[in-house]
């Protein structure tokens, strides 16, 4: 069994493997590329040059739910990007968080999307952020 690699050390091969596993989860069938596999790896390599790995991982989850192909994903990446202010926290909570962390994240999203957050809302946002950052260490 290969040793699990931390996401910050992911290469294009790791991202392709993650794409394939997420595609199976969401589409109930394996991803079959219509192109030579090296082009898919090149697509992920190009994305890694411009985006944070956690931003890419979040976008992969969105794209595989819709059954997108990798070349379309790369060409229209902005359509799949969640534009999260904290992509690392969001991905870690969604991937590894327990019910408590997930509820905190949903509360964070709820408060952060309010048009006119009160002072207590902003304070609660910083408390949630601190707690999740402490958990993510």
Please tell me what each predicted stretch does.
Residues 1-50, 54:
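Long, charged low-complexity interaction segments
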Residues 43-131:
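Short, cationic/aromatic linear interface patches
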Residues 25, 130-134:
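Intrinsically disordered, low-complexity segments enriched in glycine/proline and serine/threonine
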């Amino acid at each position: 069994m290969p040793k699990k690699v931390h996401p910050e050390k992911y290469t294009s091969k790791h991202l392709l493997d993650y794409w394939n596993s997420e595609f199976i989860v969401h589409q109930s069938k394996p991803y079959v590329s219509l192109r030579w596999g090296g082009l898919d790896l090149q697509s992920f390599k190009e994305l890694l040059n411009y985006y944070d790995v956690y931003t890419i991982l979040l976008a992969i989850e969105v794209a595989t739910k819709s059954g997108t192909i990798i070349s379309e994903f790369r060409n229209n990446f902005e359509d799949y990007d969640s534009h999260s202010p904290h992509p690392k926290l969001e991905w870690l909570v969604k991937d590894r968080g327990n019910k408590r962390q997930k509820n905190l994240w949903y509360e964070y999203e709820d408060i952060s999307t309010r048009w006119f957050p009160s002072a207590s809302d902003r304070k609660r946002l910083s408390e949630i952020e601190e707690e999740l950052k402490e958990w993510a260490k």
